[in-house]
Amino acid sequence: MNNSEQFLSPRMGRVEQIHFVGIGGAGMCGIAEVLHNQGYRITGSDLGESGTVQRLRSLGIQVYIGHRLENIKGADVVVRSSAVDFNNPEIVAARELMIPVIPRAAMLAELMRFRHGIAIAGTHGKTTTTSLVSSLLAEGGLDPSFVIGGKLNSCGANAQLGKSAYFVVEADESDASFLFLKPMMAVVTNIDADHMDTYEGDFEKLRTTFLEFLHHLPFYGLAVVCLEDEEICRILPAIQRPTLTYGFKEEAHYRAINWTQKGMLSEFVVVRPAPHKQLTIQFQYPGRHNVLNALASIAIATELGVDDDSIVRGLQKFQGVGRRFQMLGEKQFEKGAAIIVDDYGHHPQEILSTIDAFRRVWPERRLVHVFQPHRYTRTQSLHRQFVDVLSLSDELLLMDIYAAGETAIPGVTSENLANEIRSRDKRVTIVSEQSLKATLDEFIKDGDVILMQGAGSIGQMAVNLMKNM
């Protein structure tokens, strides 16, 4: 038995072949890759080709395009993405054949069961924080396994099978599936209104579900929570597990002081609990929110015994995560050249944090914001917040709402959103994928920065734009 095997779950009974429905999803492909590396035979299906599908195939994983009942042939268990409904032909066929159908989080929990699990939760910042924790543990020689909801730029993947007991995962609250997990350590970055249909529109239910998640820690586990978040402060007195806090406030256990932003470079000093000394941190990820994400990762790394030099070096070397304030390069348009930044942000708070980071990195440059709203329900429930934050852009190009499988809601449109923003004397232009390049040729001035933002198809549009569409 090699080192990578001794910390893994025992073989799952008679399970040899595992089929993933929606294997191209950010939360699915990483689990599939880890299981493939453990020796299971993996198959999967997805609606279309993608870079993720191509990567899985390059590893030797069979991926079918389209959902058909014959795709599950030979499967001992079927893993279902939360984006896949129960009427999917593969799900229906599996149930008829009495093949177990489980949610992705149940499989993630099984992978974690015999390991030292570190789960990163929160409405915003999960992917970056999970990536930072994984990077610092790797830099410290702990060789963790990880499953992240985005591509870690340093390795070009969102999952890795390490040789140690440590297993770092992004914990998803969108469908409350993080309650499947029983980690040894957990981070909660923040609690904000999103995916409220899961919580029946009840914010108190959302808040208490995060508390329940933290109570899945053992009594000797560790919760690491952000003291800057108002909702976390509300549940803090009720957390019945060992807890450390982080933030800018003086009472935080892990505290950032003297933060400065010079271009893309963030620099700050982190004050840690005794006997740990202060560290001067530099890393190429802008914005106040990313200082907080770094603090969470420093807390986890310190508590696991990663040495100071490795923490400092790991943050200096951090190359970021795909689609999180990712600079794609500079492109020449008809009236000038502009930098293109791709970002996954799709919630008003995420947009606000990104715009704040933009203003700190490029205080003299004009922000040309191309935004694709994601989901009708989110656009409807957070309409006022979207109007407020999108009004902060210098030029706003608004795309149609990306449905993400939802049925359209009457009256919930990008045009209605645009009209309310226009009532504030802001110019808004409705664009499509087909008209985007021509519109940018008309708008762009030399030195502008284009922010392509959203959780839908806009990420591929940004790549296509760099390739001259």
UniProtKB/Swiss-Prot annotation:
InterPro entries: Mur-like_cat_sf, Mur_ligase_C, Mur_ligase_C_dom_sf, Mur_ligase_cen, Mur_ligase_N, MurCDEF_pg_biosynth, UDP-N-AcMur_Ala_ligase_MurC. Keywords: ATP-binding, Cell cycle, Cell division, Cell shape, Cell wall biogenesis/degradation, Cytoplasm, Ligase, Nucleotide-binding, Peptidoglycan synthesis. ATP binds at residues 122-128. Pfam families: Mur_ligase, Mur_ligase_C, Mur_ligase_M. One of its GO terms (biological process) is cell division. GO terms for molecular function: ATP binding; UDP-N-acetylmuramate-L-alanine ligase activity. It is found in: Cytoplasm. It catalyses: UDP-N-acetyl-alpha-D-muramate + L-alanine + ATP = UDP-N-acetyl-alpha-D-muramoyl-L-alanine + ADP + phosphate + H(+). Pathway: Cell wall biogenesis; peptidoglycan biosynthesis. Its EC number is 6.3.2.8. The keyword Iron does not apply. One of its GO terms (cellular component) is cytoplasm. Cell wall formation. Belongs to the MurCDEF family. This is UDP-N-acetylmuramate--L-alanine ligase.
